[in-house]
Amino acid sequence: MQITYSKSSDSLVLSPEKASKQKSFESFINKFKSTLETAFHQDNDIDQLSIQRGLPKEVLAKIMSAHPMSLCIPKEYGGRGGTVQENLTLLSAASYESLALSLTIGINSALFLQPVAKYGQENVKMPIFKRFIEEQNMGGLMITEPNYGSDALNMQTSYVEEPDYYHIRGTKHWAGLTGQADFWVLTARKQTLNGNLQRDVDLFVCDNSAPFQKIVVDEYFENLGLYQIPYGRNILDVKIPKLQRLEPKTTGVQMLLDLLHRSRMQFPGIGLGFIKRMLDEAITHTQQRYVGGKNLFSYDQVQEQLSSLQSNYTVCSALCTKSSELADIHNDLMPLGFEANIIKTVSSDLMQKSAQTLLQLVGAIGYKLNHIAGRGIVDSRPFQIFEGANDILYAQISESLIKFMKNVKEINVWEFLKDHPLAQRAVEYLKELLNFNLDYQMPQRKLVELGKAVSRIVSMDLVLKMGENGFRKDLIDGTVSMLHQEISNLMTTFSFKQNTTVVENYEADSSWANLATS
């Protein structure tokens, strides 16, 4: 598969109203891109900024002067009331320049502003949104605790209800924008009279500048990547007014899942801009770098690597399309864990894979924090860990598949997927790989392997659907070929029976030196 250059697509005929809205957004996004160009390339050198902890205040103020946070604030509160498509486009524009900046915007939008817009009490929305628009405030979300990361629903942060406020106590860590955000959505469980904690989780808005709501940063972490985002350990002993409790439609856990699934569906927006940057850097480098009398671009192995980057770009584009279809703030995403987990895992895996590919192509010069290739490795890696570690989510994808199959009393994978709306196009290419009966009692490692394969099958289906809707055909064809190969490899791994376990006290009788001869 040869590397393919992108061309501008034919413009669609829009209604006057849609054309006006599109022009308005184009003006907004172009201003944002221009602001990033000034902040990162004219006034400063982003490669040097990226090796420092945090962004200088003047740089952040310059970026925020373009009002990126206004996009997901509803119009009735002074914001732009942007669509999911527009929000993903904003995240992509930011991640092309800085993954940390894009994540900062994503934290603010998906983990604070959207939950407040959807679940916040009416009397507190306007003051909060006004401060975001006029004072460039920021917000984040605190869930994770020491010993309660993947097991977050058993969090120990608790609250008691008093006549005028909720008293929240606990410890939270690894919340992005620690010590920097002005507002936080806090998660806690209600403490009963006997001291036990209820199973449900409640969410509260904490105004870090208000009396009795100050969160104490106990320690700042030396995070490996994403230098511009502060992380740390936070001590909570705050009193939150009654009006600042988020109001669930059903339960707090379901509200939290709606929030997290919507956030996971924003990952491809962050991923697309980042992957495009990796692709563009790789093409430029390989065209300019000569080895053995010809440029790297002309070597077959390099073409394969560049084509894989282009495939990643195409898959992430398809995931953006699906997210824009599903993730509107008015939709309840709680039941869509299958879709959200696939979108999150695939996009984050492709981000890390793309960074690794670029570094391999660039070579030693890229193994530096002040080079986009090396920085891309450490900045993209945590996306596979936070908001659900990918191996756990892959297992959940398989568990969802098994549940779906049980519901219709089907044990053959191909027979089930050929009628599934998220797989029916792709499985026509894959019958020889999927025509088998599934053992519902498979070990956890096999759940993870199958989940990876299913996520790529759904990705192929989304790519094919995007092709039907007019996306560039040569990119579609190349990506389908790449995905077919990957799915074949994943299914081979899945079919291999292997249950090796760790050998404890392995050092006994395992020294090679004792076996060596002089």
Predicted regions and their residues:
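A short core secondary-structure module
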Residues: 171-215
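Glycine-rich phosphate/cofactor-binding loops in nucleotide/flavin-utilizing enzymes
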Residues: 2-4, 10, 364-432, 440-443, ...
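Short Gly/Pro-enriched turn/cap motifs at secondary-structure boundaries
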Residues: 147-149, 175-176, 223-229
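Amphipathic, small/basic residue-rich leader segments at the start of a protein or domain
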Residues: 1-107, 127-134, 431-458, 462-518
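FAD-binding glycine-rich core of flavoenzymes that anchor FAD
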Residues: 116-146, 161-166
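Glycine-rich beta->alpha junctions and the first turn(s) of the following alpha-helix
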Residues: 221-312, 381-386, 390, 399, ...
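N-terminal glycine-rich flavin-associated loop
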Residues: 103-123, 149-152, 287
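C-terminal helix-coil-helix/basic helical segment that borders enzyme active sites and/or dimer interfaces
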Residues: 47-48, 313-346, 359-360
